[in-house]
Amino acid sequence: MSLLPVMVIFGLSFPPIFFELLLSLALFFLLRRLLQPTGIYDFVWHPALFNTALYCCLFYLITCLFV
């Protein structure tokens, strides 16, 4: 069970994972914006794959915090 309740907004029911996805997406955009000036993407073979893996790792960490 998740610590977050099911949210009902304007008659639409949102499961707790929806808010975890939004939080991890916001953290991903922030972290990506911080990593771009450092030049780490010059060492990455496939930037899109790196971004996907980064988002998945952030989502996993956020989900572990709320479970």
From Swiss-Prot:
Localization? Cell membrane
Q: How does it sit in the membrane?
A: Multi-pass membrane protein
Keyword Transmembrane set for record: yes
**Which UniProt key words apply to this protein?**
Cell membrane, Membrane, Transmembrane, Transmembrane helix
TM region(s), chain numbering = 3-23, 47-67
Q: What is its main location?
A: membrane
Report the GO terms under cellular component. Answer: plasma membrane
InterPro entries per the record? Answer: DUF1656
Taxonomic superkingdom: Bacteria
Family the entry assigns: Belongs to the AaeX family.
What is the protein's given name?
A: Protein AaeX
Organism annotation: Serratia proteamaculans (strain 568)
